[in-house]
Every structure is written in C-alpha cells, then in structure tokens.
Amino acid sequence: MNGQNIRIRLKAFDHRVLDTSTREIVNTAKRTGAQVRGPIPLPTRIEKFTVNRSPHVDKKSREQFEMRTHKRLLDIVDPTPQTVDALMKLDLAAGVDVEIKL
C-alpha cells in the first residue's frame, strides 16, 4: 500500500469516549508499524434548541438545550497490510461514529 494514506474521522457526543477510541486507534496503528498524524481536534458543532417550558401560557418562560458533536481527525501514513487488518478487527466503544477514507 505504498503512497496511500488512511484518513479516519471520528465523531461522538461524549469527548471522553471519543478520546479513548482515538487512543486505541493510534496505539493499534503504531504497534503495527504505521506512522500516525494526529489526533487533530476539529471544531465542535453545537446545536441549540429553545422550547417553551409550559405547553399553554408563559411565552417568556423558555428552556434551552444543546447538543455538542465532538470530532477528531487521524491520518495514517503508509499503512501496512497488518495495520489495515488490525484496524478492521478493532472494537470501538458504542456512540463513536467512524468514517474511513483511503
């Protein structure tokens, strides 16, 4: 796999779970002899929702909720076939979205 890079993009709502999954991927890639660039923290997407507290009256009384999506980016430079096999077998935590581009 000469000259190829693997770009891994991770997303999660909980940054602690995201960081542990990122660490697992980095350790697995380094253990198989690949060079890793990152993890690069990407901007956190914050979605805010404003709703009425009461279903009937008091329009001025509102409550706000927010949902944060944390993201990380990893580049694996010149991966070996062992690296690809190890990454395919890796079991990550639930709640982490993984996008892989070759």
Swiss-Prot record:
Protein name: Small ribosomal subunit protein uS10
Source organism, top-level taxon: Bacteria
GO BP annotations, alphabetical order: translation
The protein's assembly and partners: Part of the 30S ribosomal subunit.
Family note: Belongs to the universal ribosomal protein uS10 family.
The encoding gene: rpsJ
GO molecular function: structural constituent of ribosome; tRNA binding
CC per GO annotation: ribonucleoprotein complex; ribosome
Pfam families reported in the protein's UniProt record: Ribosomal_S10
Annotated keywords: Ribonucleoprotein, Ribosomal protein
Originating species: Afipia carboxidovorans (strain ATCC 49405 / DSM 1227 / KCTC 32145 / OM5)
InterPro entries to which the protein is assigned, alphabetical: Ribosomal_uS10, Ribosomal_uS10_CS, Ribosomal_uS10_dom, Ribosomal_uS10_dom_sf
Function statement: Involved in the binding of tRNA to the ribosomes.
